[in-house]
């Protein structure tokens, strides 16, 4: 899963 709280997440 993609964790938006984790650093390095280029999630727009």
Curated annotation (Swiss-Prot):
One of its GO terms (cellular component) is plasma membrane. The keyword Cell membrane applies. It is found in: Cell membrane. It is a lipid-anchor. GO terms for molecular function: pheromone activity. The keyword Cell membrane applies. A lipid is attached at residue 12 (S-12-hydroxyfarnesyl cysteine). The modification Cysteine methyl ester is found at residue 12. Keywords: Cell membrane, Lipoprotein, Membrane, Methylation, Pheromone, Prenylation. This is Tremerogen A-10. It comes from Tremella mesenterica (Jelly fungus).
């Amino acid at each position: 899963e993609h964790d938006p709280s984790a650093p390095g997440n280029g999630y727009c």
